[in-house]
């Protein structure tokens, strides 16, 4: 190593250690002036010798070249959201579910930061990649922007860290940084941000990382994600793993506390609520997690959230305002929803001018009229709702809210079925509002995932009568697309190609895309795995549908009702005729489940089957598909760039096959 290289390496190491002391240990070891002097020395040396710039140099935090767009990242392990508790009774019910299954537990309590969840990957101790949560499965690559956040180390401290470490945490904007940013925006005549969360989101999603670098974002780690190639055993508790993250140089909130009783959990909640305004960052509740990792694994997950954690939200903020009028909106399933138009009021960090009234029963329960003064609450600090009226402020000319008998969009009759609170337009796809929402849903990422088919394009297609149903999308040509605003031939050709590519999907996605009431992603997947074919789903009676996991009587009736409607069957048949297809899910008799009781693991990149297809095929044969290798693993399927799982399988003597052998085994070769 040359003298210049050694000097640069020493400066990088010293500056990084000072960063950790400042941001992680909260114990600055040098003055700001001294730190700045070291940084200027490093920048000068790097300017003279750009070929010697290290990957973990703090100089890289100033931002690099602007991007054209963010690329997508598939998370190594889903980034789930949390279920919410809004009252003590909600948390007590959560605690009962926990203790009924795994006995007494300790909880870890930590502030629920009002920011953005991110995933950060370190390989061999070096910062490699960062991504947003996105939809939980796929996020956006924000590596260059996260690199500019000074509290996030570019290299892990110490030793003993695994080959691959994924850290989950929250990026936020401190209150002081938010105030300073808005002052700068105002001075320049630019738009100001409503709250720190929006400012953090806007800063993190800048295509130009120099802009991100100019905004003082913070970060706290709150969990480990995927870990591969452990050098030493990981801590068996969440509290221990947070301490481990801090030892590696990652910032962890000082407010985290281990509580061994419900009384201590409630005391923590009350304390942090009382000190909320004194904290340097915005929070909107407390996250409570089961401490013991083995008990977390035993409790497992539901479709969208872990069973072992909950967000205990703070009481929502409330304000009074005037209800000026009520409009009625029609949704994708025909639901007619009354929307209150309000005199704008600032509640919980945002300006609120609309609030849902839900349905006729809710209007009657509130006794609300047009002209009333109402109390607005942001439920969970997110969704504005009217919780009460102020009777003494009611004017003499207050007007009753009259629910429409005919759809405000298509004039079809509005019906309300016995036992249901929601009134619905009977127009189906004849109703323009339902058409628009149905096609938006059909094209959405979790359904057919038509790249580039945004809401505004769908609205134009329907307004120009180019599309009447989802099936009509597949008859569009590039020349037809150019009739839309700001749609040149190149963009039109690209969009038509995306529509064509969406024809190949999965049965679960197709079922979800149909927009059947109460059938979400998880239920659609359960229907696909249970019945194996669309024909079987179409023909299933209510009793057969009730045999499917998570399908109750109401959902079963909705599914049956959907497929009993001639116009729905016509749309489905047109979609199939247009060429929509998916890999066949082979039905296997119980005595033919040749992998029943076996545990398989997939690793690396598969080139002919995607990971979900391979997993579905193995599960159809009775296998459990796990995410990590252990002595109980029966077989590892190793794709390209298999990595540490392959090495561990070989070490444990686990059977290993490649993708070609898997295809032969599944009868899909050739």
Swiss-Prot record:
One GO term describing the cellular component: cytosol
Transmembrane segments: none
Alphabetized GO MF terms: DNA binding; DNA ligase (NAD+) activity; metal ion binding
Pfam families, alphabetized: BRCT (PF00533), DNA_ligase_aden (PF01653), DNA_ligase_OB (PF03120), DNA_ligase_ZBD (PF03119), HHH_2 (PF12826), Nlig-Ia (PF22745)
Function: DNA ligase that catalyzes the formation of phosphodiester linkages between 5'-phosphoryl and 3'-hydroxyl groups in double-stranded DNA using NAD as a coenzyme and as the energy source for the reaction. It is essential for DNA replication and repair of damaged DNA.
Organism for this UniProt entry: Shewanella denitrificans (strain OS217 / ATCC BAA-1090 / DSM 15013)
Entry keywords, A to Z: DNA damage, DNA repair, DNA replication, Ligase, Magnesium, Manganese, Metal-binding, NAD, Zinc
Identification of the protein by name: DNA ligase
